[in-house]
A protein has these predicted regions:
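N-terminal secretory targeting signals
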Residues: 1-26, 30, 34-35, 138-184
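Catalytic glycan-binding domains that act on GlcNAc-containing polysaccharides
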Residues: 23-156
Length: 184
């Protein structure tokens, strides 16, 4: 008995959706590896920012835009432009993951491999960064990639991280990569 056409179409769409999700996940893991950051934290950042929607655009009260799956703020566009990345390129999930890994690496270099660095991906204001880090930790706990426990920052914690170190310049590593992710 032949399989009904609507069922075949549904199966094909589900297969393509799964393949796209796996490819996108590989972009995240590859970018994290290249920049030496935690891939699970990077993926959780993308989930927090846009649920990994590549074409996401956020409008901020200060007039800036957050672009792509990792919501890269438009204040970074002049520096990214020096490396050939424009606003529209950030709608490519792999480019967005690469830029996010670079930005997160800058925070790790500044604050150390800490929750303060994860929070600083979002904001340099300690209270906002602490809340963001707690949300990233909650995502990792939900995904069972981190044991359940109290949030990294208590609600009343007011101490700031150590003074910042100078972040490294963008390496432009994406330029030598094809935008077709490799299978793991």
């Amino acid at each position: 008995m032949p399989i009904p056409r609507p069922l075949l179409v549904l199966a094909l769409l589900l297969t393509l959706a799964f393949a796209a999700r796996v490819a996108h996940a590989d972009c995240i893991a590859d970018a994290a590896d290249r920049h030496g950051v935690n891939g699970d934290v990077l993926r959780a950042i993308g989930w927090q920012e846009s649920h990994l929607q590549p074409a996401a655009v956020g409008h901020n009260a200060n007039g800036t835009l957050d672009l792509g799956a990792f919501q890269i703020n438009s204040i970074h566009l002049p520096e990214l432009a020096r490396h050939g990345i424009g606003a529209t390129a950030l709608a490519d999930g792999c480019v967005s993951a690469e830029v996010a890994a670079w930005h997160y690496r800058r925070q790790v270099d500044r604050w150390g491999n800490t929750w303060a660095a994860a929070g600083a991906y979002h904001s340099r204001t300690h209270a906002l960064a602490a809340g963001y880090a707690n949300r990233i930790a909650a995502i990792l706990m939900r995904w069972k990639l981190m044991p359940p426990g109290p949030p990294p920052f208590a609600a009343t914690e007011a101490q700031a991280p150590d003074p910042p170190r100078q972040p490294p310049p963008f390496t432009g590593a994406y330029e030598v990569l094809p935008f077709v992710p490799t299978a793991r």
